[in-house]
Structures are given as C-alpha cells and as structure tokens.
Amino acid sequence: MRKYIKIGVAGPVGAGKTALIERLTREIASKYSVAVITNDIYTQEDAEFLTKNSLLPPERIMGVETGGCPHTAIREDASMNLEAVDEMVARFPEVELIFIESGGDNLSATFSPDLADVTIFVIDVAQGEKIPRKGGPGISRSDLLVINKTDLAPFVGADLSVMERDARRMRNGQPFIFTNLMKNENLDGVIGWIEKYALLKNIEDPASLVR
C-alpha cells in the first residue's frame, strides 16, 4: 500500500508556486518526510532556488527539464515526473509528501490523476481582480485555490472582496484561501488544508479557508 501523497502545485509564472513550496517545506519538514519535484522547460532554476532557500537537503529536491510544453509533462505524458517520483520513493521509502511543481503555465493547467493525488493552484492579486472570474480548470477544479500577494491589492487597484465573490462563484463550494507569502500570512491555513484533506488528519477546517 502506497504511504505517500503527491501534491501537484500549478499556476501562472510568478504567482508564487515555488515560494509556496519553499515556505511550506520550511514549516513542515520537521514534522513530515517531504520531497519536491520541480518542472522547468530548459533549466533547473526552481530546484536550485529551493535547494538554496528551503530547509530540505539537496537530495530531497529534484528538477525535471521538460524540454517542451510544461502542460504535457504533467498531463498527457507524465512519464518523466512519474519516474522522478519513483526515484524519490526509492531514495526515501518513508516519504509522506511529494510536492510536484509544474512549469510556468496558464489558467488551463491540470495534472494527470496518475501524477497528483490532490492539486493546489496558485494565482496572484497582481494579475488583477478579474483573474478568478476568468475561470479555467486550475481555478474551478483544483482541490485548493491559493490567491497570493494580497498585500499588492492597493497598488494594482484590486478589490479582494470582488475576488472572493468571484472565486466563490467559480469554485462552487471548493475551498480557496488568500495569502501573503512574503509574510507567511495564512500559510498555516494551507498547512491545515494539507493535513486535513491530503493527509486525512482528523482536524477542523482552518479558519482562513473560504468556501
């Protein structure tokens, strides 16, 4: 019986996918056995960032160079990522959580169900308050939607209440959460969601979770 959970993390370039994983691993690596797989088209930049900035040892971080469309590597042909998962499990048989970060993508990115057990989709306020209502599979069908960079709302003219209203409508009862990862605001809510819905801990919904 498989003992680990694979969490797919997707979202547009610059929304905060790598930052979210870096902050999460800093907080939970002492409690759970964690590994990370990143996807970049031609480089291993995200893997290198995590190696330098997260608390995980380098051998728990693996970069996959997709060499093409980042969507294909997580959906139509996930073989490279599945091989990376197998290698991580071989290295660390006790691993409990494997984060799989997609390459930079748009609102249509989805993970193959063979690759991710649950999915987190990250967007950010800097893209404008209209982003939630644009919809797309990531916004409407991910298991958790993270709306990051709330601190930038006043500078880009974004109304967080409008974003919340639109996210509620597009998500149809699925949870979402507002974060400011620069200050770790509501990071505990993301961790609580992972513990409750990915690791199936018997705990209450985080107070910062919105439905």
From Swiss-Prot:
Localization in the cell: Cytoplasm
Location (main, coarse): cytoplasm
Function recorded in the entry: Facilitates the functional incorporation of the urease nickel metallocenter. This process requires GTP hydrolysis, probably effectuated by UreG.
Entry keyword set: Chaperone, Cytoplasm, GTP-binding, Nickel insertion, Nucleotide-binding
Complexes and interactors: Homodimer. UreD, UreF and UreG form a complex that acts as a GTP-hydrolysis-dependent molecular chaperone, activating the urease apoprotein by helping to assemble the nickel containing metallocenter of UreC. The UreE protein probably delivers the nickel.
GO cellular component term of the entry, any: cytoplasm
Classification via InterPro entries: CobW/HypB/UreG_nucleotide-bd, P-loop_NTPase, UreG
Protein name stated in the entry: Urease accessory protein UreG
Lineage, opening ranks: Bacteria, Pseudomonadati, Pseudomonadota, Gammaproteobacteria, Pasteurellales
